[in-house]
Amino acid sequence: MNAKLSSSGMVLKELPEVALQKISSNYYWAVFAVFLLCAIVFPLVSIFSLPQKQTYHRFFSILSLVSCLAYFTMACNYGLKNVFSSASFFREVSVRMVYYVRYIQWLINFPLIIVMLHWTVGVSILEIAYVVCYVLFAIVCLLAAALTSSPYKWAYYGFSFVGYFIALAHSVVLHKKYASRLETSARLGFLWSIVYLHVIWFLYYACWILSEGLNVISPIGEAIFYSILDLFEFGFFGAAFSWMLDLVGIENFKSPQSIPLGACSPADDKFSMCPDMEAQNQADDLAVETRIQISNLPSSPTKNNC
């Protein structure tokens, strides 16, 4: 009997504290309400917005709806798994609740944001897919790290950070390739969006170290940290990006792909190198000179028909 009680006591000692789990659940309900409001507001705004901006509001409504579903699941204490932690800094609790539904939310939302941002400046589909693949790779590796109880979790964490860094580097390259042809205000707006996205994303890695990684912060601390990042990344960012489009002017985000094949971009002036345009101009000049020469030729005498 005593052995059973001692064994059950050991199990209870290893499980997360019920009080903290209840507090974090209540907090998840509050964040769920915020995302639910965003999921309702963005579609309504898209109805009364310009046709050019309706697509963006639909993107933001999808982000809010996915986040709303994820936080509803976490508030109901579903979509989680208890994982033994090799490092315990919080009240000697060596079992950590890992909400894998949170990573499913990121697997959907982060690629959507990447597609929306790069589609705005006319990045090609293949280059967008290249960035999205590294984003998915980073999130899957981070999920594998969270579900791993051995020190090998840090290897998965390193792989995830490498994927994040490659996605960041490629976004910078795409900014120089595509956004450099835009007007100054549009170029700065796109750069601000990329910096905002990746700075918040970097904070996710810091939060992961403190929660799933080293088990430093409590479940309620993890809930607050992650929810603030989610609100800024998937909620506030939509309103800020929409305001930026109104401030800069969506017409200033000219897509390089909308330029006919063989033509130069509007940013190319007459002193820039544009072989196709130069060849077309030379052909037009040659045609004009030919018509002038033909018109200056003496007319041949006509024969009188008797």
Curated annotation (Swiss-Prot):
Keyword terms of this UniProt record: Meiosis, Membrane, Transmembrane, Transmembrane helix
Family matches, as InterPro entries: Arc/bac/fun_rhodopsins (IPR001425), Yro2-like_7TM (IPR043476)
Gene Ontology terms: cellular component: plasma membrane
Principal location: membrane
Membrane protein topology class: Multi-pass membrane protein
Entry's transmembrane regions: 28-48, 59-79, 103-123, 125-145, 154-174, 190-210, 224-244
Xref: SMART domains: Bac_rhodopsin
Single GO BP term: meiotic cell cycle
Protein location: Membrane
Family stated for the protein in its record: Belongs to the archaeal/bacterial/fungal opsin family.
Function: Has a role in meiosis.
Name by which UniProt lists this protein: Meiotically up-regulated gene 73 protein
Species this protein is from: Schizosaccharomyces pombe (strain 972 / ATCC 24843)
